[in-house]
């Protein structure tokens, strides 16, 4: 796939403006193509980042810690790959280490990388969990994402208070219900 130039991308924005009945040469829209491209570069910056690079910094001196570690309430905004409309919500991550841990900010960075791509919530849930599982090789990973989807509120069925929840478990969380319950009870108290 050949990546379009910045000028080609700006022309595509002008084409979309004409498609919806706007005049891209009117004063209020003259700089819009450039602004859209700048915002897309920021919004979709996850494509230029490698999650495994973030997960390379591990700590092996865990004092034999083999209990639940969680980071709750990680806010995100992403864009659905079907309509390129935003969906935003909260991610809760937990894992039980085997012999290493990562810095707490790394979990939030993982969410940032995957949410700054065209996504569907189900795929993002799996990607976050599997990247942690692959890198840290913990006893298990648990993820819950709750999100509001603009493609449900701005178009189609027009339901603006619907929340979509996805959960994904690996290892001990997938195998033993008691660990899933511990995770869900832990985040329910939030």
Swiss-Prot record:
MF term (GO), any: zinc ion binding
Alphabetic keyword roster: GTP-binding, Hydrolase, Metal-binding, Nucleotide-binding, One-carbon metabolism, Zinc
Keyword Nucleotide-binding: yes
A GO-annotated cellular component: cytoplasm
EC assignment: 3.5.4.16
Superkingdom of origin organism: Bacteria
GO biological process terms on file: one-carbon metabolic process; tetrahydrobiopterin biosynthetic process; tetrahydrofolate biosynthetic process
HAMAP family: FolE (MF_00223)
Subunit structure: Toroid-shaped homodecamer, composed of two pentamers of five dimers.
This protein's name: GTP cyclohydrolase 1
